[in-house]
UniProtKB/Swiss-Prot annotation:
Organism: Latilactobacillus sakei subsp. sakei (strain 23K) (Lactobacillus sakei subsp. sakei)
Cellular component aspect of the GO annotation: cytosol
Keyword Heme in record: no
Pfam families with a match to the protein in the record: TACO1_YebC_N, Transcrip_reg
Coiled-coil region: none
Protein name: Probable transcriptional regulatory protein LCA_1307
Gene Ontology biological process terms from the UniProt entry: regulation of DNA-templated transcription
Amino acid sequence: MSGHSKWHNIQGRKNAQDAKRGKIFQKLSRELFMAARSGGPDPSSNAALRLIMDKARSANMPKDNIKRAIDKADGSDGANYDEITYEGYAPGGVAVLVHALTDNKNRTSSDVRVAFTRNGGTMGAAGSVAYMFDRRGYIAIAREGLDVDEDQMFEDILEAGADDLQTEEDVFEIYTDPKELANVRDILEKKYTLANAELTMIPQNTTPVDPEKVEQFQRLVDALEDNDDVQDVYTAGELPEEE
């Protein structure tokens, strides 16, 4: 698969995310709530919930927090969220998708627009950049200590039902049809330790970020991710390699 490594993007922001752990738990709680409300509270029959529970555990979210978020889905506390996707461009014309879960659309729309305009970006209309991304299942397997070559891994992921493999120096990145992610994950984790498994949006093509605009680009992404209502930020930006 063409494009930059998603895993390196994940790792590149890990330290910053560690410093925002409370905010991450809040966002995961909303995802758990929505998955449980739409598909039921039993992870054995709700693949989407099972994936988000794994994501929450990977983030070291306490079990009580996970249970509490799922229990709220019975509607007893009146909570509800709308899913909204915002589209726009970062500095240099880099496509950006923003996925939010909000209880106040007007507030979130205003906040996202401000984040774009204050950091050199522009908010786009619905459909302006979404077509540049594909929804995919994504699995990462770290290569450290793993005695498996690319050919063997490719054979294993095809047998599991995945359809693409990107091999990096430190990680195998596996891509699946979104509907097959949970099943592929269940099969692969019988043989491998998975570093990550999630639904994501992958850019069909990447856009190099102008070295002079890297700082502004990262400020925009940070401003969007810092918003309590924003769950995920996807970009087509390819950052220059550090010297």
